[in-house]
Amino acid sequence: MNGSQAGAAAQAAWLSSCCNQSASPPEPPEGPRAVQAVVLGVLSLLVLCGVLFLGGGLLLRAQGLTALLTREQRASREPEPGSASGEDGDDDS
């Protein structure tokens, strides 16, 4: 019976060292956690750069459209060079 008790004790010791039998989940090793943090940081930077790139493109497009609209408004206010050659007095009355 001593042999079976020693075998049972050895098996229990092996199970407790091998398998986590407590309620807490096993903690992953630090190496994969560091790699995961680096990958997450790189992906965050890529997303930030993409947002800035797209935002900058939209800003440039908006500025271009604003400049085009301003040019068109100025052109519509100014009389065309060929049409207003002799009718200068009608605007001041």
Swiss-Prot record:
Any one Gene Ontology cellular component term annotated for this protein: membrane
Feature: compositional bias, Basic and acidic residues: 71-80
Start and end residues of each stretch annotated as Disordered: 71-93
Superkingdom of source: Eukaryota
Gene name in the database record: SMIM41
Name the UniProt record assigns to this protein: Small integral membrane protein 41
Lyase listed as a keyword: no
Parts of the chain that traverse the membrane: 38-58
Keywords on record: Membrane, Transmembrane, Transmembrane helix
Membrane topology: Single-pass membrane protein
InterPro entries: Reprimo_fam (IPR043383)
Lineage: Eukaryota, Metazoa, Chordata, Craniata, Vertebrata
PANTHER family: PROTEIN REPRIMO-RELATED, SMALL INTEGRAL MEMBRANE PROTEIN 41
Compartments in which it is found: Membrane
Coiled-coil blocks: none
